[in-house]
Amino acid sequence: MSVLGALEPARVMHYFEEICGIPHGSGNTKKISDYCVSFAKEHHLTYLQDEYNNVIIWKDGINGYENSAPVMLQGHLDMVCEKEEGCDIDFETDGLCLQVEDGIVTAEKTTLGGDDGIAVAYALALLETDEYPHPPLEIVLTVDEEIGMLGATALDTSPLRAKTMLNLDSEDEGHLLVSCAGGVTAQVELPLSFETGDGEKYVISVSGLMGGHSGVEIDKGRANACQIMGRVLYELHKEIPFSLCFLNGGLKDNAIPRQAEAVIVCPEKRQSEINTKIAVISSEIKHEFLETDPMILVEAKKTTLVEKELAMTKDSADKVITALLCLPGGIQKMSFQMKGLVQTSLNLGIMKTEKDHVSLSFSVRSSVESEKRALLDKMACLTKTLGGTVTTNGDYPAWEYLENSPLRDLMCRIFEEQYGRKPIVEALHAGVECGIFAGKIPELDCVSFGPDMKDIHTPKESMDVESVKRTWEYLLEILKQLK
């Protein structure tokens, strides 16, 4: 039974619900890609599906727009897969459980994937009918945007003719995005040596954090569970000796981690001291993040007594804790040109203990290329002193602001006519695929926009139905005037 069937715009909501029924997390996009190809075949549209699962669908201009300049509509097929503790959905095989309440669409206990499923839904609803006048369309649906914009980076853009691009990967109605930061993923690896640890085993956990997008929401000042764990372990070790067995935290380098866990082995009969110290640390941290992460919790739970437990050597553990405590995180510099815009930042998104090393995955962002390089150099220098290495991947360029943008001017005018107010024209401290396409297609005029969505990349993600409808009408009018 359809959950969204009674909502308008009906065909947009129809396709969004179908998309939500198909597993399409980053790295798992074959099924959603094939779905788009099947759609193109069914509607007798020219298409291209590459080896990465990117899909391009072409449609001729209609209703007098046959000879107009082509327009690209672009979004991504993959979603961030996050779920609440206790949720048994398998993102590899299961669809989402949609809910609607008071005009707000959510998914039960998981991310919704409105980012960027709504772009795909808009595109398919436009492609299936000749009801709406539009120029020739090039629908470009990329994969793995959420893990480094890998699809857009790999895409061969030579078949594309459009010099005007509408990106549908924004989450604030009335905001027109015209520039963004560049970024890169930095992988810190610290080698480990192990020995046998004796005593009682404890699980230290940091949980209850808000999390969020590591670019868009880095300015919120929210706590990072992995870095909090480094602080907890350092504070605990001041008073109570322990051996560190392993630590893990976070799921995506572009999401602020909401939880982290470490296992330690302590001398026997120290449980009371450990609980007291952890309670003090938890209280202090909770007070510091009362406004941003009111539910933050640090706990220590004793597990089965283990006579011999494999643990890191003291030297290895000290270096790991030092890295967590001293590697930079969060906002590094604000822009002087655009008030309120973060210029340079980084986020430790994934912390994982491997067989012979600890890996720390950072998302590094800046709208100034030299600052991005300087921040990477700082990380490399500190990591080198700890005996580790830093490698980078997924480097993508900043999307520079165009002084002369006919598309931006047109969209501002149409917005004022439709809404009775001026749109907010802004830059974003996050990577969007516009930067990749602008780097590949000379003289590309591009604007990103979309309906209202909140708490993306978290299980609280939501999408406003009325905003989806207004944005659909806005999109149709833009295409109508791009003759």
Regions found by a protein language model. Give the residues of each.
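Zn-dependent metallopeptidase/amidohydrolase metal-coordination segment
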Residues: 12, 336, 343-356, 422-477
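A short beta-alpha structural unit
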Residues: 17-21, 263, 297-310, 347-351, ...
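Acidic/His- and Gly-rich active-site-bordering loop/insert found
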Residues: 3-104
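His/Asp/Glu-rich mid-to-C-terminal helical/loop segments that flank catalytic regions of hydrolases
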Residues: 158, 222-239, 267-271, 318-325, ...
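Acidic-enriched catalytic cores of C-N bond-cleaving enzymes acting on peptides and small amides
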Residues: 195-199, 218-248, 268-345, 384
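Active-site-adjacent substrate-binding region
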Residues: 224-227, 231-247, 401-444
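Active-site metal-coordination/substrate-binding segment of hydrolases
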Residues: 65-147, 152-163, 198-201, 314, ...
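Fold-level recognition of mixed alpha/beta catalytic cores in primary-metabolism enzymes, strongest
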Residues: 135-225, 233, 237
